[in-house]
Design a protein with these regions (language model features):
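Short beta-strand/loop motif that positions the catalytic acidic residue
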Residues: 147-150
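Proline/glycine-enriched tight loop/beta-turn segments at coil->beta junctions
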Residues: 140-143
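Mobile, glycine-rich extracellular loop/lid and propeptide segments
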Residues: 160-162
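Accessory cap/linker subdomain of secreted extracellular hydrolases
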Residues: 1-138
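Acidic catalytic loop of the alpha/beta-hydrolase fold
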Residues: 153-157
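Short, well-ordered beta-strand segments
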Residues: 165-167
């Protein structure tokens, strides 16, 4: 929560979006509303969403989502940690690799658990692939238009990431 809260995110109405230590808060409510909107869009387009027990549909509209049930129904595409693997064996570890194709870590969490002790990528290189490094700076002009595609069943990353970038 501390990292997300530091970004000073606001919704379209200017309301601050934050999280409490327990994961609840206005940002969690915002993410919930995005999932509901995505499911509502699918329903309106004729998709059968009845298999999702996490959704509540009343009078032809998606009215609620049980986020704990959603996490169980639409399971992860990759195991934890999804990107920076402990053994530095992921494609993302290669992306941060050396010119000699030696993979490197980009999180202290995975680096500390690596049985082979692969090196960490330099902070400057890690920052290049973190959109928040740039878009949160005052001297950066963010593109006025960009496309983020993420829907109800996307599992490559959590919706909070593209939603935060969009804000």
């Amino acid at each position: 929560p501390a990292t997300l809260n530091r970004f000073g995110l606001k919704d379209a109405d200017g309301k601050s979006l934050t999280l409490k230590a327990d994961g609840t808060g206005s940002f969690a409510d915002y993410i919930r509303s995005l999932y509901i909107a995505s499911a509502e869009g699918a329903l309106k387009s004729g998709a059968d969403i009845s298999r999702f027990k996490c959704l509540t549909v009343k009078d032809g509209h998606v009215t609620a989502i049980d986020m704990k049930a959603y996490a169980k129904e639409v399971n992860r595409l990759k195991p934890v940690p999804a990107f920076d693997w402990f053994d530095a064996g992921s494609g993302e570890n290669d992306e941060f690799g050396t010119v000699k194709n030696t993979p490197r870590h980009f999180t202290a969490f995975s680096s500390a658990r690596d049985p082979k002790h692969h090196a960490m990528a330099p902070a400057k290189e890690i920052a290049l692939l973190d959109p928040f490094t740039s878009i949160s700076r005052k001297d950066v002009t963010v593109a006025p238009h960009f496309r983020i595609r993420h829907g109800f069943e996307d599992r490559d990353t959590v919706l909070a990431v593209p939603a935060s970038v969009a804000l």
